């Protein structure tokens, strides 16, 4: 694999010390990893500090670590937490860089070809480059990723071999450096200086790496020798310091040298002729014409520019892989001895297993109708067994591990004690007869104590009817349906915490960000109807929503007790018993979590104020609108910096609305 340039140690920074059963969980996990155990499960109850335990393990075993989460929001939260725990190490973020992505597709029934359309988020693209370059430069790296990490990325060997290495005293002509930069897909632009570009002024070449957003490098020549290299502010040109070595990584992950490109183009040409013969034999003349025209254009672009839109579809030829061979992914950028941690594994594993099939069926349609060569099928996510072949050592992290994880290992390490001393809630089963009036009484009791209630139903109609009824009864209630976007969902949770309303009704309250310490009652309607949300895991996760309040209580409304209900009740009672014994032994009084009510993230507070005032932008004069745009621009940038891209997009839309009036 690739040799690392620096060999640093992980250094964990935290004002907390491991407490509860964190110390034994950390010790067991570390001992097992150092003992060579391949797979283990950290079964941590909600609110027991699993991320802190993961951080302790990483710092002690000192291996490059890949943490996989099941969506961007969760990955962003974990990235922020790990950044705080490891300020001196490389904590990187690797998720899909598309703000918007419409994959290339063909619908035969209506003869509709949908061209690939996407909007790439520049900030995330920078972070992806930062992740891959960090993995090749050092070993103290944590990459927090979504399942994007199992998608094709280009050869790490080609990527590493293409690095342009510069140091003062190196004999290289200015023109040779410019050619080398163009070869690794850097673009010359003397006016608009951005990531992945360089500019030239006499004997000075300024390079803006793809993994940076503020700092560039100034390479000064004396004849055909590098005189010195300085780090500079990209915007102002202010010198920040001198560097004695500079590694410039390619501006794209799909990079191929000239020799390999010639071979790849020849293979693409040969495959094209083969496929054209197949189409002609089958009488598919339209498909043959379409494929010939598209592929020949791409070949011309590859020859002239070394790149074409959709270059990833030719990655099999460019990487020199055989048919059916797995693509290179982020996992190949790690050294052999690395650690994988899968957060919320009961959700994430399902995603890893399902990615391949969906991608395959869409691409087969494109191949069959002459939009792509058959080799495009090998630009794909990894299959489950291919992902498993990359696993050296893995920790599955979940409150409710799935069947897959339990099949992989019998080593289950429990983390049940919460640092706050909070107990799992008491669970009781009540009959469905008169359940709504019974529930109304329970809600009123909570409202008097300024506490909140979650109600989970099985159908949309039931949720809507219940919400309408409670509104008539004078209860401040909201219904959270599946169409609500992440940002709106976060705002609803904030309003619930602030007491804008007291009751939240929903079908699936298991999504991320639904942990509300103010919730002391969780009511589960139709608890005896078996299914995804009423199986043992679903019930345990739902019960966990009341585990952040010292008054936490769960009522299941059901006429029979199913096996799933019984197992969930028994497991909750088992955990509660262990927690109570620990609290008694150590004299701990459970305290409700005191969690600051942030307005999504701090930067949105100003926006919220604007919204609260309900400013009529039509009534603002030109100068006031200009000032509002400036404010919004600043807030948008701040949102991007803390990786809240959905908020940034919302602010951007507000800006466009204001600008449209001028």
From Swiss-Prot:
PROSITE patterns assigned: HELICASE_ATP_BIND_1 (PS51192), HELICASE_CTER (PS51194), UVR (PS50151)
Short motif Beta-hairpin, span: 97-120
Entry's Gene Ontology molecular function annotations: ATP binding; ATP hydrolysis activity; DNA binding; excinuclease ABC activity; helicase activity
Domain UVR, chain residue ranges per copy: 626-661
Subcellular location: Cytoplasm
Binding site for ATP: 44-51
Role of this protein: The UvrABC repair system catalyzes the recognition and processing of DNA lesions. A damage recognition complex composed of 2 UvrA and 2 UvrB subunits scans DNA for abnormalities. Upon binding of the UvrA(2)B(2) complex to a putative damaged site, the DNA wraps around one UvrB monomer. DNA wrap is dependent on ATP binding by UvrB and probably causes local melting of the DNA helix, facilitating insertion of UvrB beta-hairpin between the DNA strands. Then UvrB probes one DNA strand for the presence of a lesion.
Subunit structure: Forms a heterotetramer with UvrA during the search for lesions. Interacts with UvrC in an incision complex.
Assigned protein family: Belongs to the UvrB family.
UniProt domain comment: The beta-hairpin motif is involved in DNA binding.
PANTHER family: UVRABC SYSTEM PROTEIN B
UniProt protein name: UvrABC system protein B
Organism per entry: Streptococcus pneumoniae (strain P1031)
């Amino acid at each position: 694999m690739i040799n690392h340039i620096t060999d640093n140690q992980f250094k964990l920074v935290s004002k907390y010390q491991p407490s509860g059963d964190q110390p034994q969980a950390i010790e067991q996990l570390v001992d097992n990893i150092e003992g060579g155990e391949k797979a283990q499960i950290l079964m941590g109850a909600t609110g027991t500090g699993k991320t802190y335990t993961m951080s302790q393990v990483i710092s002690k075993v000192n291996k490059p670590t890949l943490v996989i989460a099941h969506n961007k929001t969760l990955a962003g939260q974990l990235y922020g937490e790990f950044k705080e725990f490891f300020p001196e190490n490389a904590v990187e973020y690797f998720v899909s860089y598309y703000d918007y992505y419409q994959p290339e597709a063909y619908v035969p029934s209506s003869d509709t070809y949908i061209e690939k359309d996407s909007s790439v988020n520049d900030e995330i693209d920078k972070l992806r480059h930062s992740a891959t370059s960090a993995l090749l430069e050092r070993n103290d790296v944590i990459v927090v990723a979504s399942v994007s990490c199992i998608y094709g990325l280009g050869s790490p060997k080609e990527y590493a071999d293409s690095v342009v290495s510069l140091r003062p005293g190196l004999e290289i002509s200015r023109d040779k450096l410019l050619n080398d930069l163009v070869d690794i897909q850097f673009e010359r632009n003397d006016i608009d200086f951005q990531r992945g570009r360089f500019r030239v002024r006499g004997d000075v070449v300024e390079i803006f790496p793809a993994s940076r957003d503020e700092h560039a490098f100034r390479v000064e020549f004396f004849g055909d020798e590098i005189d010195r290299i300085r780090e500079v502010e990209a915007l102002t040109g202010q010198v920040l310091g001198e560097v004695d070595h500079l590694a410039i990584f390619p501006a794209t992950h799909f990079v191929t040298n000239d020799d390999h490109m010639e071979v790849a183009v020849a293979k693409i040409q040969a495959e094209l002729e083969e496929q054209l013969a197949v189409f002609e034999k089958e009488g598919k003349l339209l498909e043959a014409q379409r494929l010939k025209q598209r592929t020949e254009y791409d070949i011309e672009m590859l020859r002239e520019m070394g790149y074409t839109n959709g270059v990833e579809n030719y990655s099999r030829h460019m990487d020199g892989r055989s048919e059916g061979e797995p693509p290179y992914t982020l996992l190949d950028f790690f050294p052999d001895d690395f650690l994988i941690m899968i957060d919320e594994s009961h959700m994430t594993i399902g995603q890893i297993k399902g990615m391949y099939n969906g991608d395959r069926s869409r691409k087969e349609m494109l191949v069959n109708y002459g939009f792509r060569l058959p080799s495009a099928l090998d630009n794909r996510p990894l299959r489950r067994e291919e992902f498993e072949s990359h696993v050296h050592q893995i920790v599955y992290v979940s409150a409710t591990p799935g069947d897959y994880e339990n099949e992989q290992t019998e080593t289950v390490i429990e983390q049940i004690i919460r640092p706050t001393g909070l107990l799992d809630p008491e669970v009781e089963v009540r009959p469905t007869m008169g359940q709504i009036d019974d529930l109304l009484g329970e809600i009123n009791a909570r409202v008097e104590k300024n506490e909140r209630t979650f109600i989970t139903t099985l159908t949309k109609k039931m949720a809507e009817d219940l919400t309408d009824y409670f509104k008539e009864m004078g209860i401040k209630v909201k219904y959270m349906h599946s169409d609500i976007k992440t940002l709106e969902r976060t705002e609803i949770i904030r309003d619930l915490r602030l007491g804008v309303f007291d009751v939240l009704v929903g079908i699936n309250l298991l999504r991320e960000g639904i942990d509300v310490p103010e919730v002391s009652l969780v009511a589960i309607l139709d608890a005896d109807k078996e299914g995804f949300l009423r199986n043992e895991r679903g019930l345990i996760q739902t019960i966990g929503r009341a585990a952040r309040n010292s008054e936490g209580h769960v009522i299941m409304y059901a006429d029979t007790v199913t096996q799933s209900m019984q197992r969930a009740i028994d497991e909750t009672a088992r955990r509660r018993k262990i927690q109570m014994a620990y609290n008694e032994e150590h004299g701990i009084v459970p305290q409700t979590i005191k969690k600051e009510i942030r307005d999504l993230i701090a930067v949105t507070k100003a926006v919220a104020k604007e919204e609260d005032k309900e400013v009529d932008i039509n009534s603002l004069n030109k100068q006031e609108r200009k000032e509002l745009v400036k404010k919004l621009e600043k807030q948008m940038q701040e949102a991007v910096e803390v990786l809240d891209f959905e908020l940034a997009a919302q602010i951007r839309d507000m800006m466009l609305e204001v600008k449209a009036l001028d």
